[in-house]
Amino acid sequence: MAKHERGLRFQPTGGSKAPQIPTGKKQRLSIERLANDGRGIAFFEGKTWFVLGALAGEEVEARVLGAHGKVVEARTERVFSASELRRPAPCQHAGRCGGCSVQHLPHNEQLALKQRMLAEQLSRVAGAEPEEWAAPLTGPEFGYRRRARIAVRWDSKAKKLEVGFRAAGSQDIVAISECPVLVQPLQPIMTRLPEMLRRLSKPQALGHVELFSGSSLAVLLRHMAPLSEADLTILKDFCAFHEAQLWLHGEGEPQPVDDAQSLGYHLEQWDLQLAYRPGDFIQVNAGVNEAMVAQALEWLKPTADERVLDLFCGLGNFALPLAKAAREVVAVEGVQTMVDRAAANAASNNLHNTKFFQADLSQPLTDAEWIGNGFSAVLLDPPRDGAFEVVRKLAALGAKRLVYVSCNPATLARDTVELIKQGYRLKRAGILDMFPQTAHVEAMALFEASQDGSSDPTGRP
């Protein structure tokens, strides 16, 4: 599934170069502890090894994926002495597929790893600890993913079409017969997809496939050459059998074969329907997404006489539920097409107390028209880069309460430093288990303005 293992950035150190370890070499290692990304850490012959699929205290044989300087990245090939925490991998493709990098850890241990990662970032970078730790926000550990991207590639030497997910540490494609983290309605589509694609007349012109599950099922095919009528019939019949929409992505933007069809998802607690298109960002975990929105509103506590600001609003995932509680919601997003989509979603849900604006939120906030007389509360849901320029000006907007939803604890911790400088205190924080079986951490933090306007480096009043 989705890959969350990130490559390391190396800097030249000068001096004589140590001989590099060749890719593919196998080495027996003793794993001392876990890194924040879930990989095992070992030390051998002056080098630090980061080993996928290994746990603290284990003896493993690892295969080198890449090396530079004193850092080696590797993957577990064999476990000689297993940790008592290790469980059998729930997926038959474990160790080959590049997704689900911590599925060998029980779910409660995965949560502990993510909690530790968030706490360490806040402590190390911001010197802060929340006054209260919220319980992890969780859902089912399997069958949660409502969107998936399937790699498709023509092997000209073998004269065959490869269909599956990217392998761990390489661009190879691993054939996948089933994926335990996909929602159940997508499983039969996933299983039968390779056979259908191999029936098409120009397999070398096929790109990736995306699967969607929401208010309806959908299959999107990226193709680099026009499809024949026979191929189009095969695709239509496949989607009709699975009761799924068919979307095609040739030149230009993806389009449904049936113009009347659209993609969307429902937020049941607020009876809201949000439409989106392929390429738009949505949270892949529907259950945790709805619980996240509910928790954000519970923490922010918007009232019927308050003006609330939603930054990085996307499709309106937070803005529309906020509009059910607040007097007015001003929502800002960097991409104009998403602004238009959010405004259309508000209109289709008969919400008229929302205003949507486009602004580059990576730049310092200026006297934008949407600021007006300020806001009682602010919600932020930035991308991985965080919201540094935005948080530098939030105190000037008069907000007493801030909820920060983060997909990167490192930038959340960095931005926490700035918020504390402005007189906010870190009231509450917790993890959101949006991606079970991976080490990817989502988090939510509540900041409140100190009554006397003073700040404390610990985040406490």
From Swiss-Prot:
It is an enzyme of class 2 (transferase). It catalyses: uridine(1939) in 23S rRNA + S-adenosyl-L-methionine = 5-methyluridine(1939) in 23S rRNA + S-adenosyl-L-homocysteine + H(+). S-adenosyl-L-methionine binds at Q283, F312, N317, E333, D360, D381. [4Fe-4S] cluster binds at C91, C97, C100, C179. The keyword Phosphoprotein does not apply. Keywords: 4Fe-4S, Iron, Iron-sulfur, Metal-binding, Methyltransferase, rRNA processing, S-adenosyl-L-methionine, Transferase. GO terms for biological process: rRNA base methylation. Residues 20-78 form the TRAM domain. Residues 1-26 are annotated as: Disordered. Pfam families: TRAM, tRNA_U5-meth_tr. Its EC number is 2.1.1.190. InterPro entries: 23S_rRNA_MeTrfase_RlmD, MeTrfase_TrmA_AS, MeTrfase_TrmA_CS, NA-bd_OB-fold, SAM-dependent_MTases_sf, TRAM_dom, U5_MeTrfase_fam. This is 23S rRNA (uracil(1939)-C(5))-methyltransferase RlmD.
